[in-house]
Amino acid sequence: MTVQTFTPNQTTTLDTAKKTIEQQSQELTPSGGNKIGFVSLGCPKNLVDSERILTQLRTEGYEIVNSYHDSDVVIVNTCGFIDSAVQESLDTIGEALKENGKVIVTGCLGAREDEIREVHPGVLGITGPHAYENVLEHVHQFAPKPEHNPFTSLVPDHGVKLTPKHYAYLKISEGCNHRCTFCIIPSMRGDLVSRPVGEILSEAERLKNAGVKELLVISQDTSAYGVDSKHSLGFANGSPVRQNIKALSEELGKMGIWVRLHYVYPYPHVDDLIPLMAEGKILPYLDIPFQHASPNVLKAMKRPGRAERTLDQIKKWREICPELVIRSTFIVGFPGETDEDFEMLLEWLKEAQLDRVGCFKYSPVEGAAANDIDDQISEEVKQERFERFMLVQQEISAAKLQKRIGSTMKVIIDEVDEEGAIGRTYADAPEIDGLVYLNGETSLKAGELVDVLIEHADEYDLWGSLVRA
């Protein structure tokens, strides 16, 4: 049994690879204590929820194991973003019930308890997303707290992490105030609730002290941070800090490690972040989901943006910060998308020259308003548009990476094996973007920052050699 993440055709941009509990075995499994199995599905935001639950379980003395048969209880943290994710979650619950029999369900699908009970009436307990205390209450009921010395710490200061030790996700808020017609996140996770700025910065400091070299800032809507508190003043280390994304980014930028922003909704005040990137305070990397370029489709999605104005914005951003890398996601085959709408999207894509792009064929989500829109698109047309879109972007990406050849770039090493090292530049987020291959460099270590001369490129990845002093 592994801690894993399901990667559905969702409109969020950031996905995590499968992570096994074994990777954290020394932190998670000292002897003694009732044994808990754990499966985590979904996006990085769900992964952070899993880390928080696991941290509390370890704090209370529970042992985390990677086998159904060795577990006293199994927790499944579910995804419910689209129908295929729902099915994956239901299948995983069924597998856990078959292999173990004692299952607690949490996460996004947990908000739809009746649907779970209809398929799997034998689950012990169900909670919605970020209901950490309720999860622990269910665990206490079916696997009582182990006895352990409360003065003996069973977890590191930064808590249990399911990512490699050199990078970590930093969730700054929960929920979303938008009502995009393809999305049901607000119905599962509620409206925006921002974490206190001092709490976020304290966590970031603990992660840095634990050896984290890269913070991946995530939420449902990162650029809306602090809207719910009307951007009131918070405090960090005794000093006042305004609770908005610009001020938070400035404070994170003082830590001297990579800070990467994800899920940045295209508000006008995104303009305020670009100078911070130009000054080197945060990485010049903007993950901003435009979703489409046709005004008709954007209106049907209840998304902001006019094609020409967005192009002007992108041009201005690049003038301020020439090193800026823009990642975005798009949906093709949205209900009502005409041939003209799609051609407009392709022309916009050619003009925008984005660096990293994800494209998803529209997939219906139970409860989403888009399901009621007339003129649903056939799967055949969706696939044809998806392939054409990706071919256009592939050519753009290849041309952009060719320009990297001959330059020296800072690379963070992700893994090393007998063939060499693999890393990423500032232009690449873990799991979703490209890689840099260093063939033969077997003496490097994960988390090292090294200078690399770029010597070769394809459509998505780079190859280079280590620059030695």
From Swiss-Prot:
GO terms for molecular function: 4 iron, 4 sulfur cluster binding; aspartic acid methylthiotransferase activity; metal ion binding; protein methylthiotransferase activity. One of its GO terms (cellular component) is cytosol. Residues 162-399 form the Radical SAM core domain. CDD domains: Radical_SAM. One of its GO terms (biological process) is tRNA modification. [4Fe-4S] cluster 2 binds at C176, C180, C183. This is Ribosomal protein uS12 methylthiotransferase RimO. It comes from Vibrio vulnificus (strain YJ016). The lineage of its organism: Bacteria, Pseudomonadati, Pseudomonadota, Gammaproteobacteria, Vibrionales. The gene is rimO.
